[in-house]
Curated annotation (Swiss-Prot):
Keywords: Cell membrane, Disulfide bond, G-protein coupled receptor, Glycoprotein, Lipoprotein, Membrane, Palmitate, Receptor, Transducer, Transmembrane, Transmembrane helix
Organism lineage: Eukaryota, Metazoa, Chordata, Craniata, Vertebrata
Described function: Role in sperm cell division, maturation, or function. The relative order of ligand affinity is GRP = neuromedin-C >> neuromedin-B. This receptor mediates its action by association with G proteins that activate a phosphatidylinositol-calcium second messenger system.
UniProt gene name: BRS3
Protein name: Bombesin receptor subtype-3
Subunit structure: Interacts with C6orf89.
Organism annotation: Cavia porcellus (Guinea pig)
């Protein structure tokens, strides 16, 4: 039995699939509210600012992620276990930037949904798949960093790269499975304004006439794609912090200087992944909170105030911006990636020359990697350290 909601005085929502009226005044926790159209639509200055922001996110994000992916595939020293996950993360971000972000920008230009029922389902599926790939990959990366800190010199099997590719593929499959219900329930609905004799279509991610389903959808999304993964990541980083603290206390006096360098190296690598996690948490929190507010507070969709409009725009832009910040976070944290990034950006031919092995400092965190020109797999520097630029001593193989 549908749970009827109070009807907005000047709007009626009807499903175009069954052409039956529903008294819900909401459209989607991700699409529109009354303040976006009609008399309450933003002025030309606001629209210009919105489109410029979206254009910057799309162009900068595509450029940054494309270069990151190119660096990974063209530079053998970057093809390591953690960097496979980081590249998978970039692929998910690139998918979102090429599809969902441009479509979202059309909401401010057109009076409704332009991409039909199939487009509604496909784009809903892509959006949630990309979010799942991001947060689940960060969770696996945190587990990988924990293992590297606890057992830094453990020799990994020769097929570690292949296994990591399989894990990355499983993350994509799992994300798609979680996104399927949203694709199934997504539908196009028509928003009718009797006062202006106007109708417009919008894509909703759940049956809009079912208030309970709206609440369940928002709550499950918040738990599965935010709270639970970040809680797991928090546990791993608590264990990492405890391990690093104990290793500092147990450093022998005669090896104080050398061991402290190893501990500092561990901290730098863990910090890289932690920065990516923090960026995800910061960028997606406002969007999740706004979705919960819209789903559990009926009158939220009738709020046509400028403040509500600004908060809505801010949460969406911040969420999409997460898809373009990771390459620049790596650029900031990694001298090696800075050089590779600049080389690819300015179309330099070939890879940058590798620095002399004897002149490079020790990085004690080891994972499996391949040495260029050989088929043997050895203990080597941690994959993220390739981005950080902490190659290894002469006696050790460098990624």
């Amino acid at each position: 039995m549908s749970q009827k909601q109070p009807q907005s005085p000047n709007q009626t929502l009807i499903s175009i699939t069954n052409d039956t009226e529903s008294s819900s005044s909401v459209v989607s926790n991700d699409t529109t509210n009354k303040g976006w159209t009609g008399d309450n639509s933003p002025g030309i200055e606001a629209l210009c600012a919105i489109y410029i922001t979206y254009a910057v996110i799309i162009s900068v994000g595509i450029l940054g992620n494309a270069i990151l992916i190119k660096v990974f595939f063209k530079t053998k020293s970057m093809q390591t276990v953690p960097n496979i996950f980081i590249t998978s993360l970039a692929l998910g971000d690139l998918l979102l930037l090429l599809t969902c972000v441009p479509v979202d920008a059309t909401h401010y230009l057109a009076e409704g949904w332009l991409f039909g029922r199939i487009g509604c389902k496909v784009l809903s599926f892509i959006r949630l798949t990309s979010v799942g790939v991001s947060v689940f990959t960060l969770t696996i990366l945190s587990a990988d960093r924990y293992k590297a800190v606890v057992k830094p010199l453990e020799r990994q099997p020769s097929n570690a790269i292949l296994k990591t590719c399989a894990k990355a593929g499983c993350i994509w499959i799992m994300s798609m499975i979680f996104a399927l219900p949203e694709a199934i329930f997504s539908n196009v609905h028509t928003l009718r304004d009797p006062n202006k004799n106007m109708t417009s279509e919008w894509c909703a991610f759940y049956p809009v006439s079912e208030k309970l389903l709206q609440e369940i959808h928002a709550l499950l999304s918040f738990l599965v794609f935010y709270i639970i993964p970040l809680s797991i990541i928090s546990v791993y980083y608590s264990l990492i912090a405890r391990t690093l603290y104990k290793s500092t206390l147990n450093i022998p006096t005669e090896e104080q200087s050398h061991a402290r360098k190893q501990v500092e190296s561990r901290k730098r690598i863990a910090k890289t992944v932690l920065v990516l996690v923090a960026l995800f948490a910061l960028c997606w929190l406002p969007n999740h909170l706004l979705n919960l507010y819209h789903s559990f507070t009926h009158k939220a969709y009738e709020d046509s105030s400028a403040i509500h409009f600004i908060v809505t725009i801010f949460s969406r832009v911040l969420a999409f911006s997460n898809s373009c910040v990771n390459p620049f976070a790596l650029y900031w944290l990694s001298k090696t990636f800075q050089k590779q990034f600049k080389a690819q950006l300015f179309c330099c031919k070939g890879e940058l020359p590798e620095p002399p092995l004897a002149a490079t400092p020790l990085n004690s965190l080891a994972v499996m990697g391949r040495v260029s020109g050989t088929e043997n797999t050895h203990i080597s520097e941690i994959g993220v350290a390739s981005f950080i630029g902490r190659p290894m001593k002469k006696e050790e193989n460098r990624v």
